[in-house]
Every structure is written in structure tokens, then in C-alpha cells.
């Protein structure tokens, strides 16, 4: 209040300003009164072409109601007003900000994103208490030097502007913790960036950078660095010393090799897809003990080293669209791996139908091949019992050796009784009835309830889940993709051990409510349905949920509270009709999407 009181004085031009303001959308006096009490004013999305003068002078002019109300009630003590500390002017039609912004010296947050600003007032430099400035999604071509005087600024959001250069003294903003410069026209970064030692998140995505300054390694607090979609051919070797780095995004550049990061012991996510990387070697991997996400899709990688098994915390590995012809069978020993993408590779030792069975089936197969690989490393792997020879009716070898009952790709409408009879004295743990013409789940599946833990009914014509299936109390994996399901029975709640369920390519219009109560679920695949909404509060209760695939549904909005589901490591939302988060945010990966959603939660 002190700063505002010192500036409080009569305004001889008030009459002229008031007349001009009558031509602009009015700001309700109720909002102004509330802002004087709370210190916060939200004018987002009001169609403002300019900021009314009485907003800038909110703490200077005597409120009009003070002349009309002489009761001096406790609720009307206008002289006890609070200095404005938070001003939101987002999503209007502002072309400029007045220099009168200096009349709000107590501001800690100023949000002017999504306007049409082409410049910023030099008076911003006088807001010495400012901690967060959001001027993203405007048309800014430069930043005033005075902005560098904001020594307490912690968050500066400049994404989606037209900046081609930054002031050399940018490093003066020593308190910065978050800096977003994505989607501009930057060709270089000032060397003074090295002084930003408190920076935690730096986003340089979608610019025109050809290299990064070696001095960037001085940012010892940096946890997230996003250089997606630039022209980088390499990264400085000094990057390897950034010990705090947790997320590194290098997608859509011109890299020919992965950087070696021996000191990045905390790195959890490395995204380097859509580059020109040809070699993945042990040196790239051996120090990354904390890595949970490795994304290398759309490169030219020819082989995967056995050292991939050093990444024991890896949960997501994306190697799609490379030149890989053979996988090391030891890949099956990555016990935490929940998602493995291999499509678009010329794999000779893995059949396509096996790839379609999902990550867990593939890992299981790779583990089963480890001993054979040691015994005859130069031989092509023989046909295994994972698929049955077409002339074989029931594969007893698969039943007795692999505990697998496989009657897939027979195009039958009913599973013959002798198939179930074959396993009476040989309990199986896996059942594969996929790619048939089944319209219902076989009732005799209940006979397997004491042993089976993995069931595949994918690619049939099943319209409902039977109660018999709900008795399989040991079930951990259930695949019912590509059927005609519209709902799930509440009795499925009894499947208390179920970890993975695949419901993709069905006809669900609502998210099956029973899934919210199946708290052991780690993976829900529900892509290519017609789901219109989700309940983030219920999802947050699912503390084991790590993967949620809702691609190609009918979601009109993504609830911001979904960002609080911090156990999610893979969240796929592409192909829905919602407008936010935008595609550029989705492309950054799950962590960025969740962070964006959290930032949208009303406070």
C-alpha cells in the first residue's frame, strides 16, 4: 500500500479518459471492488482493445462509491484496500500496454498472453516486485532492455512470438526459474545465459538454433531443457556435466549421434526422435541409470546394444521407424518396461503378429528366447509355440511347456469343447483366442480361473463381457481390443489383480466406470473409441496407473485436474476434438502435458 499511497493524487485528465473508456467494453465495478479487497483482478477474455485507465489507477483514485457511502461500515473501508498484486489480461485484443503499468508497483503476476502486442512498455522495468510475466502468444519482435531490471522475476513466458534475438544482458535476470522461448525465430542464445544459475526449466523448442553455447552447462539447477525442432547438428560436450538435468528434449533436429551424458545421473527422460542418428552404443547408455523414457523413433538406428539392459528403470522405449533388423533377447529383462514401440522396422526375428500382441507379450517372448540365443547365436529362431502351425488343431507342446492355450486365427465362431478338455490336467497361465469370429466369451473360460493370468480375445465380434470372465481372479492382463463392446459389467471390479487392459477399437461412448475402482490397473488402452469425457478425480485415486491411452476418441475438453495424476508416465491424447492442450504441447510428451494441465487449474 505504501507505494500506491505515495503515488495517489488527483488526475486532471480523468474526465477525458472516462469518456474514452465508455467506448470500450466496460469492466464491472463489482470486479474492481473485489480486486481492491483481494489484490487480484482477472479481466481475461473480455474483448478489451485497451486497458481502461481506472484499472491502472485502481489503487490511486478514491473509489466513486466512497463519495456515496458515508456509513464507514467494516465491509466498506475502502481506505484499507489491498495493493493489486495479480493482474490477468489474457485472451483480449490488446495491441499495446500503457506505460501506466508503472502505477501498479506491487504487481507480482502479470498475465497478458494471447493478445496482439507488438511491443512491451519500458515501464515494466519499474515493477520491481514482479515474479511472473506471461506475454506468450503475441506478436513481440523484441524485448525492452528495461525488462532486464526485474531482479525478482522467477517466471518469464515468451513463447509464440516473433522474437529473432534477445538482449545481450539477458543473464541479469538471475532469479529466473522458468523461461519459455519456444516458437520464436531465434538463431542464437546470448552467452550471458550462463548467469541464469537458478533456472530450472528452459524451453527453446521451435526456433532456428544451429548450436547451443557451451556456457549453458553453467546452469547447475536446470532440470528440463527442451530444444525440440531446431537445426542442431550436435550438442556441446559440456552438456554432459549438467548433473541436475532430468528431462532432455532433442526431437526434430539434425543430430547424427546421441550425446554422451556421464554426469547426468538424474536424467529420467531423453527424447531424440526424428533426427539422423545411426548408432546407439554402450557409451550412450551406461550412465543413464535413472532413465524411464527413451524416445528414438524416426531415426536411422540399425541395432540395439545389449547394454540397453543397463536401463533397469526404463518404462517407455520408442524405437519405431528405424532400420533395426534384430533385437537383443535380453531386452526382455527390462522388468519395468510398460511400452515398447517397434513398428516400422525391418525386424526379421520377430513376427508381425507378435508385435501386435503388446509390450508384455513381446517381452515374455524375448525372455523365452534368451537361453536358445546363447545355445545357437547364429541360427535363425525356429517357429515357436507363440503361434500355432495352421495344420495343428491344438498345440500340446505350447500347453505343457509354455502354459499357453492358443486357439487364435481359426476364424471360428465357437471354441470347441476339446480345446478346454485339453487343459484339464495341464493348467495354463495364458489364453489366446484372438482373431476368430467369436460373438461371446466362451462360458467354459471359468474352468481356468485358478491358473490363468493372461487372456487375449482381441479381433473378434464380442459385444459384452460375460460374468464368467469376471471370475478369473488371478487375471493380470486382458486384451479385448477390436471388438464391438459398448460397456463393461460392474462385476469386473472382482478382478483385483488386473494390471493391463486393452479396450482399443471398440464402441465405448463413456469411460467404463468400473475401471475407476480397479486400483491395481497400471495400463488402460482405450484408443479409437468414442469416449466423450473422463473423471480426473477418480483417475487420481488409481495410484498404480502409469499408462493411459485415449487417442482418437471424442474428448471435447481435457480437465485441468488430470494434471494432478502424477503417477502417469504415458498419457496419449492425440486425435481428439479438444482445442487445448494444443498439438505442440502434446508433442512434448506426458510430463509437459501434465505440467500444462496443472497450470490451468483455477486457483
Swiss-Prot record:
InterPro entries: Leu-rich_rpt, Leu-rich_rpt_typical-subtyp, LRR_dom_sf, LRR_domain-containing, LRR_R13L4/SHOC2-like. Residues 1-27 are annotated as: Disordered. Keywords: Leucine-rich repeat, Repeat. LRR repeats lie at residues 83-104, 106-127, 129-150, 152-173, 175-196, 198-219, 221-242, 244-265, 266-286, 290-311, 313-335, 336-357, 401-422, 427-449, 451-473, 474-495, 497-518, 520-541, 544-565, 567-588. This is Leucine-rich repeat-containing protein 40.
Amino acid at each position: 500500500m505504501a507505494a500506491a499511497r505515495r503515488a495517489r493524487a488527483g488526475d486532471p485528465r480523468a474526465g477525458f479518459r472516462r469518456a474514452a473508456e465508455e467506448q470500450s467494453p466496460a469492466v464491472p465495478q463489482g470486479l474492481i471492488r473485489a480486486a481492491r479487497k483481494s489484490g487480484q483482478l482477472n479481466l481475461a477474455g473480455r474483448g478489451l482493445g485497451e486497458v481502461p485507465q481506472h484499472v491502472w489507477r485502481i489503487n490511486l483514485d478514491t473509489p466513486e462509491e466512497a463519495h456515496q457511502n458515508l456509513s464507514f461500515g467494516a465491509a466498506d473501508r475502502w481506505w484499507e484496500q489491498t495493493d493489486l498484486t495479480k493482474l490477468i489480461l489474457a485472451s483480449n485484443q490488446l495491441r499495446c500496454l500503457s506505460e501506466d503499468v508503472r502505477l501498479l508497483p506491487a504487481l507480482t503476476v502479470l498475465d497478458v498472453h494471447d493478445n496482439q502486442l507488438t511491443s512491451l512498455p519500458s515501464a515494466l522495468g519499474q515493477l520491481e516486485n514482479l515474479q511472473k510475466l506471461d506475454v506468450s502468444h503475441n506478436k513481440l519482435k523484441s524485448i525492452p532492455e528495461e525488462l532486464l531490471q526485474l531482479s525478482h522475476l522467477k517466471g518469464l513466458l515468451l513463447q509464440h512470438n516473433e522474437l529473432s534475438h534477445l538482449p545481450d544482458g539477458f543473464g541479469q535476470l538471475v532469479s529466473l526459474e522458468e523461461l519459455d522461448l519456444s516458437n520464436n525465430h531465434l538463431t542464437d542464445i546470448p552467452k550471458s545465459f550462463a548467469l541464469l544459475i537458478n533456472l530450472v526449466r528452459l524451453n527453446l523448442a521451435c526456433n532456428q538454433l544451429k548450436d547451443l553455447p557451451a556456457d549453458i552447462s553453467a546452469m547447475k539447477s536446470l532440470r528440463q531443457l527442451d530444444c525440440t525442432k531446431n537445426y542442431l547438428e550436435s550438442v556441446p560436450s559440456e552438456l554432459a556435466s549438467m548433473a541436475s538435468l532430468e528431462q532432455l528434449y532433442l526431437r526434430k533436429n539434425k543430430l547424427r549421434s546421441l550425446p554422451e551424458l556421464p554426469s547426468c545421473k538424474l536424467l529420467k527422460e531423453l527424447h531424440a526422435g526424428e533426427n539422423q542418428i545411426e548408432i546407439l552404443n554402450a557409451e550412450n547408455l551406461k550412465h543413464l541409470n535413472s532413465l524411464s523414457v527413451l524416445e528414438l523413433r524416426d531415426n536411422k538406428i540399425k541395432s540395439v546394444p545389449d547394454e540397453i539392459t543397463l536401463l533397469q528403470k526404463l518404462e517407455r522405449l520408442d524405437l519405431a521407424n528405424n532400420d533395426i533388423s534384430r533385437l537383443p533377447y535380453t531386452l526382455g529383462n527390462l522388468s519395468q518396461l510398460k511400452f515398447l514401440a517397434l513398428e516400422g522396422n525391418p525386424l526379421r526375428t520377430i513376427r508381425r503378429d507378435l508385435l501386435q500382441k503388446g509390450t508384455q507379450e513381446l517381452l515374455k517372448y524375448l525372455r523365452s528366447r534368451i537361453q536358445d540365443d546363447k545355445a545357437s547365436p547364429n541360427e535363425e529362431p525356429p517357429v515357436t509355440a507363440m503361434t500355432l502351425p495352421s495344420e495343428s488343431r491344438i498345440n500340446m507342446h505350447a500347453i505343457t511347456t509354455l502354459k499357453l492355450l492358443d486357439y487364435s486365427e481359426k476364424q471360428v465362431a465357437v471354441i470347441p469343447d476339446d480345446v478346454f478338455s485339453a487343459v484339464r490336467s495341464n493348467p495354463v497361465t495364458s489364453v489366446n483366442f484372438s482373431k476368430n469370429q467369436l460373438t461371446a466369451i466362451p462360458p467354459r473360460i471359468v474352468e481356468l480361473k485358478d491358473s490363468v493370468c493372461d487372456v487375449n480375445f482381441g479381433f473378434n465380434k464380442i459385444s459384452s463381457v460375460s460374468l464368467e470372465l469376471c471370475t478369473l481372479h488371478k487375471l493380470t492382463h486382458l486384451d479385448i481390443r477390436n471388438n464391438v463392446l459398448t460397456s463393461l459389467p460392474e462385476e469386473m471390479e472382482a478382478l483385483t489383480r488386473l494390471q493391463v487392459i486393452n479396450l482399443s477399437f471398440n464402441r465405448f461412448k463413456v469411460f467404463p466406470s468400473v475401471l475407476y475402482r480397479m486400483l491395481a490397473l497400471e495400463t488402460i488402452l482405450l484408443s479409437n473409441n468414442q469416449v466423450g469425457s473422463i473423471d480426473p478425480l477418480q483417475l487420481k485415486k488409481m495410484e498404480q496407473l502409469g499408462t493411459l491411452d485415449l487417442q482418437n476418441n471424442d474428448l471435447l475438453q481435457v480437465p485441468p485436474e488430470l494434471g494432478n495424476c502424477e503417477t502417469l508416465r504415458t498419457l496419449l491424447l492425440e486425435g481428439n476434438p479438444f482445442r487445448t492442450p494444443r498439438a505442440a504441447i502434446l508433442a512434448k510428451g506426458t510430463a509437459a502435458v501434465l505440467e500444462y494441465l496443472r497450470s490451468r487449474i483455477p486457483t
